[in-house]
């Protein structure tokens, strides 16, 4: 055996049987946990990059740019659009190339939009089209979620998948609040003056260096890339062709569960992208950047809790109750907005925190539903055609990972639709109410869908 093969095999797990209790306790658990925590670190940074424009767009006009409100909302929405599209091919990558190698590549390329954005904001003559392109490149970070969640699903047994996926997705989602907490702080610090970065004077006498919000992530991404290269593993049994993963698209439940995930995760990422801009338009006297991080923080932690709670009480039950509360909070939001009166920022903020909480919790519970339902369907279908238990388990793992990737792609569309809907509604009517009415109707439809398809009986094996 060559030295190169020996080095490669250090990271390749050719024998991986997480459903075997003895194997799991003696060997599998430690390996799975190590891969999980490195994955969480990489995904957290990816979410920081993905939602970078939610903090940058609010400040662009303060440093010499002159973009309209609708243009700024568009910049916050575009990363979610490209991220959603890219999640489809990204969902194939782990079975094709291996989780370790793909995590390394997908993390290191995020340095490109961060570095470019840092240069772009230093020149007020930078065209809007350049910012649109950088925003679309930030979408590569959002696509990481599909491959990351699919990869982690290979490492854990069925009984622990809800918790593992909740931790990976929830703490990964925490990157949104980490970015929205750190960015408003670092843009007023002389971090990169040694590289010639100069802040733009503000009315209060401070210097705003928006470059810092982008460049601060570059060294962290480099460290995460090295951690993935030296600390993660590829699973030999996870290898699968694109053709072998496509049949999941024919299953009705993939599309039904996609709608539920669009309503939960799509809301979380959409509100994360657009909340600061929305609050600024409705309550311009409030410095929202000091408070914006708390909503994504609540939602990210709630996602982790959603997976754990669903493992205990059932994903369907948790998801159903959660959608009822999402509809309730959306209805209450109408009462907080400026209309004939000034509105109430305190009430607006508290109700929106409730929306972040339920969107995050529902993201975890719907992902648990997806993992459980697709595993059940695949096991049933393989055994129905006379396949062995080993074959059934192997196909169940591959199909579940493919389904998680496809559904996460559709869910990410909410990150584009929600801020764009707010921007369009404000441009047409001067109010976000029109967009909120659509959200309310969608949540109510999801209550009915969850109850009628999954709440009254087990899903049909199709």
From Swiss-Prot:
Q: Which residues lie on this side of the membrane: Periplasmic?
A: 57-71, 123-124, 202-206, 280-287, 339-341, 423-432
Q: Which gene encodes it?
A: narU
* Membrane topology category: Multi-pass membrane protein
Report one GO cellular component: plasma membrane
Q: Give the UniProt record's GO annotations in the biological process aspect.
A: nitrate assimilation
Q: Which GO terms describe its molecular function?
A: nitrate transmembrane transporter activity; nitrite transmembrane transporter activity
Protein known as: Nitrate/nitrite transporter NarU
Family that this chain belongs to: Belongs to the major facilitator superfamily. Nitrate/nitrite porter (TC 2.A.1.8) family.
Which PANTHER family does this chain map to? Answer: HIGH-AFFINITY NITRATE TRANSPORTER 2.3
